[in-house]
């Protein structure tokens, strides 16, 4: 199937099979489609709603074409979201990665610049001084020595360059928002993934089940956030032991007080970084303490997904203890320092 045939199917509100989606994605990712065709395809898929078969097909092609990162670490975990929730909250999952590392976890963080939001994970880390142009083996060394390595999506998904223009011009969430968290170049099989709609939680978990993931929590908060929220109950679809279960959690389940998100929104990466540094440091402001609580909730989920904790409650306690040692902030500075060395190596 080619993209023109696929567009005719989508206009008629007909779904594609996994194999048909793979064929179309290969056309897109190898530069055989025009920007207009790609834009129409992305919007058509969104209006129709993507099926599990379609997402599996698209993700499998992206994985196939990705530049891999080989990391010698057990229970490698990724913390990321689809983006597109429109909430403009600080970079919770990126901050959580450093808390996970401080607690002894190994994080292969996969991310990009903001597409529809104010601050993507790459924007935040760059603002902090992290060098993004790492080679695969340098990412592996970051994970092994610091506990966190960042894989800048464009460096590992070169074929994505063909869709960057249409995505940016649309400025809306598309199937690619869903694919990012499912195409970790290091092959992390343990993840916490925030999604922009509760309706996506179970389908995403089922897609990851088919793609071979081991322990994943897909989350969406009642207030619309694609993170575990401090302000509202959060719906969770958990993939564990080959089965998907669904449940709701709230901050009080972990002895954390529910609070509003006021003060946690940002307009740019620099504001996000300032809030995160306060949260991971001495928490001198009320907003810094709130941000810390939210980071702990999400880092705790990641420690549980990585099987460093036997329950969510235990994971949150481990995250709380790790954050309050100050080691998480040190991990951020360690990553900045190590990537600066790699930058010198790469640029001579």
From Swiss-Prot:
Reactions mediated catalytically: N-(5-phospho-beta-D-ribosyl)anthranilate + diphosphate = 5-phospho-alpha-D-ribose 1-diphosphate + anthranilate
Residues that, per the record, bind Mg(2+) 2: 226-227
Binding positions for Mg(2+) 1 per the UniProt entry: 93, 227
The UniProt record lists the keyword Glycosyltransferase: yes
Superkingdom as given in the UniProt entry: Bacteria
Binding sites annotated in the UniProt record for anthranilate 2: 167
GO cellular component: cytosol
Positions with a binding annotation for 5-phospho-alpha-D-ribose 1-diphosphate: 81, 84-85, 91-94, 109-117, 121
Quaternary organization: Homodimer.
Name of the protein described by the UniProt record: Anthranilate phosphoribosyltransferase
Lineage, top ranks: Bacteria, Pseudomonadati, Pseudomonadota, Gammaproteobacteria, Pseudomonadales
Name of the gene this protein is made from: trpD
